[in-house]
Amino acid sequence: MGPSFLTRRRASSILHDVVRERVVVIIPARYASQRLPGKPLLEIGGRPMIWHVYERARRVPRVERVLVATDDERIVDVVRRAGGEAMLTSSHHRSGTERVAEAAMHVEAEIIANVQGDEPFIEPAVIAAALEPVLADPNILMATTSEPMESAQEVLNPNVVKVVTDREGFALYFSRQPIPWPREAVRQWGSLEAALRAEPSLLRLYRRHTGLYVYRRELLQQWAAWPPDAS
């Protein structure tokens, strides 16, 4: 998994007392998935997908609490019967981040990690990598992670979100389209797919966004209050 990259920093440096900030992982999980209804409860190795995510999040150092935020009593029941913590949230959220923001209103934590409920194989080290820059610098308001892509099919897949960063690891662009665009290689080979097959080294240009986010509470609350883009 690639290094974490930062997406938001305070405009000005603010001195903070050195304190141990509370870290909570919130796992948004929606039952009525359009592509695969009931996905969080699908069994993998005899256990529900959501419980695999929960247990992996619980193994991350510095995480004091793990909470599933869902819109369905069935998911709440499964998590609680397994010994975990779950909260019922609104069924009208437009995104997992909105669900996380609602759940965060009921927890005491300065740093909140949003770990997707359909990532049963996520490594605890990846979550820790996303937490690291936020824990290290009080001026960092948000962080996320990316990983290298391994095939032309992945680069061309619109269901895979790509990211371009600067040299310091700050995100510049996110897109479902292939970014960056190797213009000269495409011109030479006729298409991006042909270029990627002819020059496998081009794959090193592409990184997949993992969908994992870490927020400071203040930014998450601001985000939840912003109106949606009308475009």
Specify the residue positions occupied by each region the protein language model found:
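Short aromatic/basic micro-patch
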Residues: 35, 121, 214
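Short, high-confidence coil segments that cap the C-terminus of an alpha-helix
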Residues: 63, 109, 137-140
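Short phosphate-binding loop-to-helix
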Residues: 67, 73-132
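Short, positively charged and aromatic/hydrophobic N-terminal segments
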Residues: 14-15
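Conserved core of the sugar-phosphate nucleotidyltransferase
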Residues: 124-227
